[in-house]
A protein has these predicted regions:
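Long, structured stretches of catalytic cores involved in phosphate-ester chemistry, encompassing
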Residues: 1-185
């Protein structure tokens, strides 16, 4: 009820486990399915997505634990942003339901659009899968509109935006960014 009544421009939900991409392979740790996230609770997950999709503002599900970073557009109003790993090896794409690096993907009842991800083919030795990424979330609700060059005058955007920026953990270089505008004026 709190989310539904919120007057915030954006709603953020944090989950310690992934929401849309499965962890069905264990590789070195476990050879069989070790999926222990929202991807095994289809009914509950669909109820959440359907409720969030009816919100007046975008809903961002921030997740981790899958050992890869990715951005998934679940619906026009619901997104998943995952960041990691920070201190352990990445997973092969085969450990994650044979998902593509980007594009359409379906695991369970709902097709999603993977906008970007770290993605590792299974011909890479596991000890070479150390590719940490981190995500910086920036909310732009004002912009500088000075009356004189070099001045400062902050003006509110009619529709603020959130920018999710993914950086390489080794080099600090920007790898991907996704911007989402508020849906209501």
């Amino acid at each position: 009820d709190g989310m539904r009544k919120s007057d915030a421009d954006f709603l953020f939900v944090v989950s310690s486990v992934n929401f849309m991409l499965p962890h069905v392979g264990g590789g070195k740790v476990r050879a069989n399915n070790k999926d222990d996230a929202w991807t095994v609770f289809y009914d509950e997950r669909e109820k959440l997505i359907n409720a969030w999709d009816k919100m007046d503002q975008p809903v961002f599900v921030l997740t981790g634990d899958l050992h890869n970073s990715f951005v998934c557009k679940i619906t026009e109003n619901v997104w998943e942003f995952a960041s990691g790993p920070h201190n352990s090896n990445n997973h092969y794409y085969t450990d994650e339901g044979d998902r593509p690096a980007n594009g359409k993907f379906k695991y369970g009842p709902r097709e999603i659009d993977i906008r970007w991800s770290t993605h590792f083919r299974d011909d890479i030795p596991r000890d070479q899968l150390g590719s940490p990424h981190y995500c910086v979330v920036q909310i732009n609700n004002v912009y500088n509109n000075p009356k004189q060059i070099g001045g400062t005058r902050w003006v509110a955007f009619p529709r603020p935006q959130v920018i999710f920026q993914y950086f390489d953990g080794w080099t600090g270089k920007l790898k991907y960014a996704e911007a989402v505008q508020a849906t209501r004026d």
